Amino acid sequence: MNNILASYKEKYKDVWVLFGCGGERDRPKRSRMYKTAQIYASKIFFTSDNSRNEDIVSIKKDALPSDLPDSTSIIEDREEAIESAVLSLPKDIPLLILGRGHEEFLDIKNKIIAHSDISSVKRFF
């Protein structure tokens, strides 16, 4: 995450990022991911990303500070988060949607839900 954000920040004045933290995995990494996003991104969209059987409230508590800045939006539904980010994105600012890549399913409460970040973005272009 650090490498890609740093690379984009070298080329662009502003960068927006959308990401989430997986459930039942790497709890200590969650807050580091958010802090990394804060270093490079002027706008952060925090959303779901394979919460598995872990409650999203627990994931948010691990990842986000209690005094959340205005530059961070929390939108639990990943599809809605992508829509909000794309529709509010100013021209000439890149939006980095991180974490899912080519995956076509989300694991939410141990239910497999069809979802593709790529398809979600393509709806707007």
Task: Report residues per predicted region.
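ATP-dependent carboxylate-amine ligase
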Residues: 1-125
